[in-house]
Amino acid sequence: MKSCGTLLTPLYRLPSPLGPLLLAGRGGWLSGLWFEGERHCPTSHQAEARPQCLALEWDGAHAAVANLPPFVKTTLRWLRAYFSGLLPLPPLPDLDLRGTPFQLAVWRELLDVPFATTLSYGALALRVAHRWPRPSVGVRAVAGAVGRNPVSILVSCHRIVGARGALGGYAGGVERKVALLAHEGKWGEGRGEANSGWFFGCLPQ
């Protein structure tokens, strides 16, 4: 995971069961994945920049699909496995996350929260405190960094919940957070059975 460099550039727009996703990369590394229009998504990735994005389909029918960069193919395979409920999940693409040192410390901890597991903001703050060179880490500061996570789903900010199991916020919208946690069997009736097995068809190898 890298931590410095130039601004993100919009690259690809792809459908998902929870709405369109915008995927960005830098130097062959995944640097951003947002639900379209979500809070904290860079302005350049909103609707006015959409013509600059390459639209992808999960059936691989787009003419340029064979020429996709390796990190894009890896991201697509991971997302298909995730939304299809295929475990264990494949390896993550290489990540190029940009933020303050504190934000990077929080995001590194998010990478260690497993599928179908939730962690409170307070517990996350304690984990960050073990690596952060200050005597204490505030829960509000941690929550702010979680909300600024630039790679949705893969860097699992949706698994961070409030005290005593309260849902808490989500930059992509609370409804999406509920759906993602239900898909993983951690929220709501049916423990995710209704949402598991979302179908995406074939992806390029």
Task: Describe the role of every protein-language-model region.
Residues 1-133, 183-205:
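Basic nucleic-acid-binding alpha-helical/helix-turn surface characteristic of O6-alkylguanine DNA
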Residues 40, 151-153:
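Mobile beta-alpha loop/short-helix "lid" or hinge segments that flank ligand
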Residues 129-144:
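Short, positively charged loop/turn segments that connect secondary-structure elements
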Residues 145-147, 154:
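Major-groove DNA-recognition helix of helix-turn-helix-type DNA-binding domains
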Residues 159-184:
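Long, intrinsically disordered, low-complexity Ser/Thr/Pro-rich regulatory/activation regions
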